[in-house]
Structures are given as structure tokens and as C-alpha cells.
């Protein structure tokens, strides 16, 4: 299952040139949904990951930004791009407070969420470089254990 299925995204695109050349946010659209319902759907699809979120449960989400790793530092760019919600792997406390103040939802899904896309990236690299062996780490795991 890849990003678009996990997050129910359509029309995914890179917007880095629109803001600045260092912006790595990908933008996608979702059918109009309340934040609480969207978080529930993402949580169901990412059941092996611990997640948390910031924002008003009733906020309507239609445009979602996603960036792997500690991407909450892209909050300003997400707002400039018109995102209702930013999904990332790591959020600091002050970034969560800023998101609340500025009215954008944040979903923190675990820094290790990037692992979901390793096989997809492997397929892309094999097609681009058919004479090279492309391996995916089988040892790298999320160091955190979920406690439910």
C-alpha cells in the first residue's frame, strides 16, 4: 500500500518550485472530510505506527501536505500552499502550538513511516537503473514500540 492509498490522496504533486527550491512537500487532495474522520482513516491504515494530531476535530480537510521525517519545519510552506493539514514524521511541541494558532492541522505519524515506501522506491530505482542491484534494508526498524 503506497502513500496515495494510505492517505486517500488524489492529484499528488510536488510544489517545490512554487514556494522555493528547498521545499520537499508533496500535495494531494482528499474528498471533503472532518479532521477527526481523516485522522481515524489514516490511523486505521497505519496501524503499526503510533500517531498523534493537532487541530480542531471539526475542521474540514481537502488539501493535504506530506513530508517525511521531521517535516513540521515546513509548516509555513504548507500554509502558503493552502494545505488544511500537514502530515509528517516528527513534530516539536512549539510547532504543534504554532499550528494550532495558525489554524492548520498536523498529523504526526512516526519518523519511521518512510519505511512504507522502501519497496516502491526500490521498484522505481530498478526501472531507472536496470543494470544495478537495488537492495532494501531488512534490518532497519522503528526503534519505538507502540503501547496501547
Identify the role of each PLM range:
Residues 3-148:
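Active-site catalytic microenvironments in core metabolic enzymes, especially phosphate/sugar-handling
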